[in-house]
Amino acid sequence: MMRVRLIGFTASVLLLLGCATTTPETVKSAEIPGSPTSNLAPGQCGLFGWSTDDTRSFIFYADEKSARYASADGPIDLNAQSAFPATEYRDTAGDTVSLRLGEGETMVGGMRYPSARIATLTDEGWERLQPVAIIKTCKPAE
């Protein structure tokens, strides 16, 4: 009798855990207007960044030629200050936007940087950090 109760209790706990750990519904990422998010040419590499909050919004894109960032003030085009993957950019007003990649992890098809930050300066001179998860990937050459 004790064994039947134990089996029943265990089954109930497993059922409850199964219901409590279902995967949350995925939120569709917001697109950065004008970004070629998945149109890498063969042999081309890109950096793709999503916010780390609950929305997981698509907020950063960079390739060898261009970069775009969805800042708190709206989307801005960026010019790389070094070779790809650049970590220093300037916007059209000449303000610096820094990409701090942090520790990278190898993944199939590229690298991921789960604790990256995008750093900008406010008008008052304060540094604003935007947590971002970055993926670096390259489309194989044909």
Range-by-range predicted roles:
Residues 1-9:
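Bacterial N-terminal signal peptides that target proteins for export
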Residues 16-18:
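C-terminal motif of bacterial Sec signal peptides marking the signal peptidase cleavage site
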Residues 21-142:
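Cysteine-centric segments in proteins
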